[in-house]
Amino acid sequence: MKITRMHGAGGKVMQELIKDVILKNLEITSVNGGIGLESLDDSATIPIGDKEIVFTVDGHTVKPIFFPGGDIGRLAVSGTVNDLAVMGAKPLALSLSLIIPEGFNLEDLEKIVKSINETSKEAEVAIITGDTKVSDGVDDIIISTAGIGIVDRGKAIRDCNVQEGDAIIVSGNIGEHGLAILLSREGFDFETNIKSDVAPINKLIERVLEEGIQINAMKDPTRGGLADALNEMAEKSNIGITIFEDKIPISDEVQSICDILGLDPLTIANEGKVVMAVKKEDAERCLEILREHPLGKNAEIIGYATKEHKGVIIETIVGRRIVDMPIGDPIPRVC
């Protein structure tokens, strides 16, 4: 069997690759009883004293490298910061590894590095180490970022802890990142204002936690979109999730173009959103806090967790249907 791009596009195919090839061949996958690789959460943890170091890594290859709303540099910082933030951690520092193709435009490289700098300042996260390689074996720049954060011991927020009755909240309009990439890459003749939502969301999440909101589970709906994130949360938590079609925040533009192209916005990648499972009693206050922040102005309560069924069910005007985990992200090379 040959590896295809689908194996790195989120969804069922990537999950199978990770479990059947990678996990089964690695034996030491956690430290000091912390959250390890086998959990397949957004980050791992290393307990030290009364704290836990939260650690994650992300590789980024996107085509085009500059797109409406962002670029590969902003994407690299945001993706890693967000993986730390959805664990309830305070992001502290990043590493930066660049694999640059021979012949790459120097002005483009400087533009990317400046974007990395601006995004790290926005997130208030330092870039403290790195590595640079120039290669004739790649066709475009690849950026890998590792990140560390900190959280009180035992307070990391897992994606496997959704509780019955929890409100399911998404922090804003979905589908924008993947669609912005697709339209920019393929040159569709659409007049559109769609831009990627790529942004660090650590300050948004921090605000919710500071207010004492009980978040039982969190995930950022990147590759595979909202459908992938909700299915992972439901499966790992051994619970069902019901969502309501008319509550899911989607801009008219995104919905219209998805309809034209035959795409499901639930499966399209986001890079500046968070999905939260929040204690029912805290849900309305959580929504208020999110909407006070520019990155959460379109936040909505989209459903609830239930033991009445497994998996993810969506209620529509014509009835109920199952929301499956996608086979893979319908738009390759988005992150």
UniProtKB/Swiss-Prot annotation:
<comment type="similarity">
    <text>Belongs to the HypE family.</text>
</comment>
<dbReference type="InterPro" id="IPR036921">
    <property type="entry name" value="PurM-like_N_sf"/>
</dbReference>
<protein>
    <recommendedName>
        <fullName>Putative hydrogenase expression/formation protein MJ0676</fullName>
    </recommendedName>
</protein>
<dbReference type="InterPro" id="IPR016188">
    <property type="entry name" value="PurM-like_N"/>
</dbReference>
<dbReference type="GO" id="GO:0051604">
    <property type="term" value="P:protein maturation"/>
</dbReference>
<dbReference type="Pfam" id="PF02769">
    <property type="entry name" value="AIRS_C"/>
</dbReference>
<dbReference type="InterPro" id="IPR036676">
    <property type="entry name" value="PurM-like_C_sf"/>
</dbReference>
<dbReference type="InterPro" id="IPR011854">
    <property type="entry name" value="HypE"/>
</dbReference>
<dbReference type="Pfam" id="PF00586">
    <property type="entry name" value="AIRS"/>
</dbReference>
<dbReference type="InterPro" id="IPR010918">
    <property type="entry name" value="PurM-like_C_dom"/>
</dbReference>
